[in-house]
């Protein structure tokens, strides 16, 4: 059988039509049947402008917006659902992460943390590879922050309401003076955590590890000498805590551990329980206690059974 030009054209058109049907029409029909998820809501006008800036400035190249079953990081308690993305055109799922996934990022930090972060990411995350976005100016940066704070939709709205509530309380405590501020911060910690014994020696090696952790995670806000005057400080309200005022204020290792682990919602202090395992939290707490507070309860009783590597 000879292949005529007409047969080639018709065959090619049939193949093209099949591809269009499978790749375009079938997914379109399927997505039209998708129902909104329990967290879905439409974007505000400011969030929509911020999303355009997010795309235009290449944020999607490094940040995905899809939590998968294999993920163990931020937001992994809830796996992404098709109904989360009904208003996304285009969808910004992403497949490779240089930075963290941002789909649940809304409300994880207060707005002022994001101002410092976008001005220079090293101010809040000293090891960050992210470029600075101070060139956007205050107005565009504000739109970008609104977009990020909306990621997570209704769940993000709940987190943002919590940030706003606790920020007002944290600012009031700070403005009441150092004594009232420290007392308020300590009052938010369960008694059991305040009294938990610090099992780790302040050894030379442990303090060196704590110093490295402090440089990698804490220096941008609390500063190199722990006085709260890191490069992020001018952008933050309330400002980072000055550790040097904590001497003789009954700051136990358990208090430091709890605050590092859980953070202080409403302030720029994030939680680190997903990034630092228990020993690293103890060691950076010991570093702060020894070098900035000059008061440590390390290696206190009851210690239980020492770990195998301990002297």
State where each predicted segment sits:
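Short, non-ligating residues that shape and space the ligands of small metal-coordination modules
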Residues: 68-69, 227-228, 278
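Glycine-rich, acidic and aromatic/proline-enriched surface loops and short helix-turn segments
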Residues: 19-27, 120-123, 224-227, 262
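Surface-exposed patches in mature extracellular/periplasmic domains of secreted proteins
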Residues: 127-133, 155-162, 271-273, 295-301
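Electrostatic cytochrome c docking/interface patches
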Residues: 31-55, 67-72, 173-215, 301-311
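The canonical Cys-X-X-Cys-His
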Residues: 50, 56-65, 114, 130, ...
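Extracytoplasmic electron-transfer domains, predominantly the class I c-type cytochrome c fold
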Residues: 36-47, 72-149, 235-292
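Conserved catalytic-core motifs of eukaryotic protein kinase domains, centered on the activation segment
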Residues: 231-233
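Extended surface/linker regions that mediate inter-domain or inter-protein docking
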Residues: 1-31, 133-194, 199-202, 206, ...
